[in-house]
């Protein structure tokens, strides 16, 4: 299934800068409540069924602590300039078999600027997804603002590619060039035949994941990524973890805090995912559709308030009408032959995700309404010549699918999906069906699906 038209959970820095100063410099956000675990894994908060993994991560962390990280200048292809340094941390593919197959996780860092006397340790970042790379974190925040400069005095900034992502044993589910081809089918089905076609694509995508990355799939889970985090912590020589997670990264942080409560020093979470096990992940995506609709309306209100600039209407209803006209036009004949409703949703989806995208998207939309179709085509159409970018997009989508589908059990009965999304679409049409097709491979996922951890949260 080719799904590059839908971007996944935000992989961004968002408003985390303010949280870094308020929290990292002052104190910790409460970690998820859990009982402490001895170093050998006995009495682990999830000892029943998790004994092997608990012991495995202890073994892997001890190895990593001895090995450390062989920091070097980053490979030119990573586009991470000096003084950022890069390296790898070795972890087991399967923590139940710590002496079995190993994979390497890419990490990078930039040292704290305040000297040894001010240093409070390493700050490890996850941007969300799942499927987002954190390697750009040190480069993007260094010198970005006074807020980050203050945190940089005390912390080494550390990024990493989670397992399966980028330079860390990357997985794939489809040919990247086929993955990005456009236009895709309209996500909103007009008939039962449309639904059958989308179901077929979802089933084929799940099969492609197994064919291309079958060995990795059973181990592409949030708990395993949390275990990887603990091994990285050990490799860095840190007794406790300082962590910043955004969007999905907040769930990763919650799982880490549940598995390793004694290893948490300070933890900052921004744009929080509800970690309740009955939400992960089917219900969470339905809830996300509701949130998207609310944010979509907020953007439309902002556009209407700035009608003197964008000329898209001075009420939300008028802006929505312009959107529906655009969508109908693209459904009838894709703009430039490549931008249909799916590509439009992918482009406009950034508005609900990021306030910083509001003005650029409104400006492009305004140009279209004024007669400049090409500006919108250039912004929304895939670039088939960008082979590296397309490979990255396909990889990110593969990891997203693998983690969410393997993390938890999903409905296997199509009638459940059809009922829930048909109902939800009536009042929340912007993303509902696009999100449904994005996740439908989980209904026919070819490897065993796990039961989410019972993340017990405490007061923050």
For the regions a language model picked out, list residue spans one by one:
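Catalytic-loop region of hydrolases
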Residues: 2-15, 26-187, 192-195, 226, ...
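Alpha/beta-hydrolase fold active-site neighborhood
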Residues: 45, 56-58, 320-459
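Alpha/beta-hydrolase active-site loop signature
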Residues: 130, 163-166, 207-210, 249, ...
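Glycine-rich nucleophile elbow surrounding the catalytic serine of serine-hydrolase chemistry
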Residues: 133, 226-227, 245-259
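Active-site-proximal cap/loop segments of hydrolase catalytic domains
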Residues: 170, 176-235, 446
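A catalytic-pocket lid/entrance helix-loop region that shapes and gates access to the active site
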Residues: 172-184, 255-318, 363-373, 383-387
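Alpha/beta-hydrolase fold nucleophile elbow
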Residues: 236-248
């Amino acid at each position: 299934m080719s799904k590059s038209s839908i971007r996944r959970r935000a992989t961004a820095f968002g408003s985390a800068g303010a949280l870094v100063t308020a929290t990292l410099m002052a104190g910790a956000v409460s970690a998820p409540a859990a009982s402490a675990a001895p170093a050998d894994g006995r009495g682990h908060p999830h000892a029943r069924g998790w004994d092997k993994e608990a012991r495995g991560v202890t073994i892997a962390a001890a190895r990593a602590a001895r090995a450390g990280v062989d920091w070097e200048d980053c490979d030119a292809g990573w586009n991470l300039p000096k003084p950022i340094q890069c390296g790898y941390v070795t972890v087991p593919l399967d923590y139940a078999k710590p002496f079995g197959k190993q994979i390497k996780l890419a990490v990078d860092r930039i040292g704290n600027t305040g000297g040894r006397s001010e240093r409070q340790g390493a700050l490890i970042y996850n941007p969300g997804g799942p499927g987002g790379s954190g390697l750009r974190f040190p480069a993007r925040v260094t010198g970005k603002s006074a807020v980050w400069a203050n945190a940089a005095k005390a912390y080494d900034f550390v990024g990493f590619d989670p397992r399966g992502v980028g330079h860390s044993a990357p997985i794939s589910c489809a040919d990247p060039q086929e993955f990005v081809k456009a236009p895709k089918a309209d996500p909103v089905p007009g008939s039962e035949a449309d639904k059958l076609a989308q179901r077929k694509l979802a089933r084929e995508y799940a099969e492609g994941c197994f064919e291309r990355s079958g060995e990795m799939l059973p181990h592409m889970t949030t708990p395993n990524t949390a275990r990887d985090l603990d091994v990285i912590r050990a490799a860095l020589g840190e007794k406790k973890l300082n962590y910043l997670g955004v969007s999905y990264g907040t769930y990763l942080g919650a799982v880490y805090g549940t598995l390793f409560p004694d290893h948490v020093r300070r933890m900052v979470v921004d744009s929080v995912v509800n970690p309740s096990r009955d939400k992960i992940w089917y219900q969470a995506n339905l809830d996300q559709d509701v949130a998207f609709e609310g944010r979509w309306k907020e953007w439309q209100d902002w556009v209407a308030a700035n009608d003197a600039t964008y000329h898209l209407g001075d009420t939300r209803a008028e802006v929505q009408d312009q959107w529906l006209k655009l969508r109908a036009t693209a459904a009838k004949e894709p703009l430039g032959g490549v931008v249909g409703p799916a590509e439009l949703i992918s482009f406009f989806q950034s508005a609900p995700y990021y306030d910083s995208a509001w003005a650029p998207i409104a400006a492009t939309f305004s140009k279209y309404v004024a007669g400049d179709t090409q500006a919108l085509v250039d912004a929304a159409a895939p670039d088939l010549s960008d082979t590296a970018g397309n490979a990255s997009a396909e990889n990110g989508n593969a990891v997203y699918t693998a983690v969410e589908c393997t993390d938890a059990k999903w409905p296997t009965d199509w009638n459940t999906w059809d009922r829930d999304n048909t109902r939800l679409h009536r009042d929340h049409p912007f993303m509902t069906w696009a999100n449904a097709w994005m996740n439908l491979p989980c209904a026919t996922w070819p490897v065993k699906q796990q039961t989410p951890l019972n993340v017990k949260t405490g007061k923050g």
